[in-house]
Amino acid sequence: MKKIDSWLTKHGLKNRLTLVVIVIFIIFLILLFMFVNLSDEDTGQITITENAELRTGPNAAYPVIYKIEKGESFKKIDRKGKWIEVQNHAGTEKGWVAGWHTNLNIPADQSLSSNPLKGKTIVLDPGHGGSDQGASSSTPSKSLEKNYTLKTAKELKKLLNKEGAHVKMTRSNDKYVSLDDRNIKGDAFISIHNDALDSSNANGVTVYWFKDKQETLAQTLNSAIQKKALLTNRGSRQQNYQVLRQTDIPAVLLELGYISNPTDESMINDQLHRQVVEQAIVDGLKQYFSS
């Protein structure tokens, strides 16, 4: 006690009450500073700092619900990694936004600034081949599925190589390859097909997956193709195909139009349209590996 009195006297403080007041004042300043700098994350509200997308899940592989603009605010519901689940103030819409598009000071993923396909091994599986011609058209051109799956795969391979990806082909010419022999390892497996039905009315693109780990890739590619291709979008669907069942890597089977539909067939035959679809597949893969 004498030491405290001596310290108070030395610093011109006549009583302990003055010291208590100073301590309380310092604590008040600290609390005030903390309150002023309280982030909106703690208050349950976030603000969008740059134009972004509201998605159905916590990474860029999920489909976009709608575009959101800089300055909009949302109620924060949850957080997974660098992604924030939000709800609009009306309570009518929920979705996920990347945290680096908000005022929460979350750094962007480093992978977004580099080429996400560089060094990735992509397996391309042109359906059918050799004695297995696949589907065929009923038009005078008599288009064969096996020919166009191979053309698409070769053209897609060039685009992927430009992105720094290593591409493996289950076949690179018109030969028969068993389904068992198509089980090649990589970072992603893309089986390329054209659909067909007895009715010429069926049309469009379908993306198939089987295992749960394949669904995100399917949704991502379906969304990317939908943005660019002129073909009708039939969505992503679960189907027990052997090439999907037998692999342990992310895999999809793409039905890129109905060769039995004259309109779809003309687009399948058109190199420019194939290039649009192929670029959409590349975009989807880049988005998938950026997530």
UniProtKB/Swiss-Prot annotation:
All copies of domain MurNAc-LAA, residue ranges: 122-286
Region named Disordered: 123-147
Biological process according to GO: cell wall organization; peptidoglycan catabolic process
InterPro entries cross-referenced by the UniProt entry: LytH, MurNAc-LAA_cat, N-acetylmuramoyl_amidase_3, SH3-like_bac-type
PANTHER family reported for this sequence: CELL WALL AMIDASE LYTH-RELATED, N-ACETYLMURAMOYL-L-ALANINE AMIDASE
Stated role: Probably involved in cell-wall metabolism.
This protein's name: Probable cell wall amidase LytH
Species per Swiss-Prot/TrEMBL record: Staphylococcus epidermidis (strain ATCC 35984 / DSM 28319 / BCRC 17069 / CCUG 31568 / BM 3577 / RP62A)
Phylogenetic placement of the source organism: Bacteria, Bacillati, Bacillota, Bacilli, Bacillales
